[in-house]
Amino acid sequence: MAKNKRLTAAQATVERNKPYGLSEAVALVKSNAKAKFDETIEISLNLGIDPRHADQMVRGLISLPNGTGKTLRVGVFARGPKAEEALAAGAEVVGAEDLAEKIQAGEIDFDRCIATPDMMALVGRLGKILGPRGLMPNPRLGTVTMDVKGAITAAKSGQVEYRAEKAGIIHAGVGKASFDEAKLVENINALVDAVQKARPTGAKGTYLKKAALSSTMGPGVRVDVASFEA
């Protein structure tokens, strides 16, 4: 009941169909993040694309200027010296066939998956498990690489993966409620800029149609797309 009352009270502070300027939206979302834990601030971007078409996919990685406030657990497929490099760089899970067996058994104890190129024949067999979870290593995202240390460091330093879902919507965490408003605004503008630059050639008409911000337990707040920094 307390949660429902808190959400109802928070919703009363937000005009449902009003698009707010970015700074005002961030302030509203922060003020309504009153849970006992540090809530994640998430942005939703509604894009004018149809991801079912290969030429309208939007996906990428960006290192947010102020990090995400979340420590990612990293899994790495590698052997020999590269496996040792991964462990030294702070990867939580490192392996080859043994790691594949754990994943097939449902043990997926990581948020980002990295692989050296020679491991992709093995990793490819896990596509039906890793793909739907957004964990499949991808050379275009820098997660299939011989620079294992660099990829792990980037993942742990506030790197965010964004990917448009079937409806053309991107959901991404941009920080924590404890962040200063200015840092959240900077992170959001950086993410939106990356998404804008990733506009696919097949996209027609208005690309960035709608945007909204919310905290883990708070109501959504519409954001005026014109208020993002170009």
UniProtKB/Swiss-Prot annotation:
Q: Which PANTHER family match?
A: 54S RIBOSOMAL PROTEIN L1, MITOCHONDRIAL (PTHR36427), LARGE RIBOSOMAL SUBUNIT PROTEIN UL1M (PTHR36427:SF3)
InterPro entries annotated for this entry? Ribosom_uL1_bac-type, Ribosomal_uL1, Ribosomal_uL1-like, Ribosomal_uL1/biogenesis, Ribosomal_uL1_3-a/b-sand, Ribosomal_uL1_CS
Key word Ribosomal protein present in the record?
yes
Per the UniProt record, the source organism is Gluconobacter oxydans (strain 621H) (Gluconobacter suboxydans)
Q: What does this protein do?
A: Binds directly to 23S rRNA. The L1 stalk is quite mobile in the ribosome, and is involved in E site tRNA release. Protein L1 is also a translational repressor protein, it controls the translation of the L11 operon by binding to its mRNA.
CDD domains with a match to the protein in the record? Ribosomal_L1 (cd00403)
Q: Which SUPFAM superfamilies match?
A: Ribosomal protein L1 (SSF56808)
What is the official name of this protein in its record? Large ribosomal subunit protein uL1
Q: How does it assemble?
A: Part of the 50S ribosomal subunit.
Family membership, please give it.
Belongs to the universal ribosomal protein uL1 family.
Q: Which Pfam families match?
A: Ribosomal_L1 (PF00687)
GO: which molecular function terms? rRNA binding; structural constituent of ribosome; tRNA binding
State the GO CC annotations.
cytosolic large ribosomal subunit
Q: Which domain of life is it from?
A: Bacteria
Tell me the keywords, alphabetical order.
Repressor, Ribonucleoprotein, Ribosomal protein, RNA-binding, rRNA-binding, Translation regulation, tRNA-binding
Database matches in Gene3D superfamilies: 3.30.190.20, 3.40.50.790
GO BP annotations listed: regulation of translation; translation
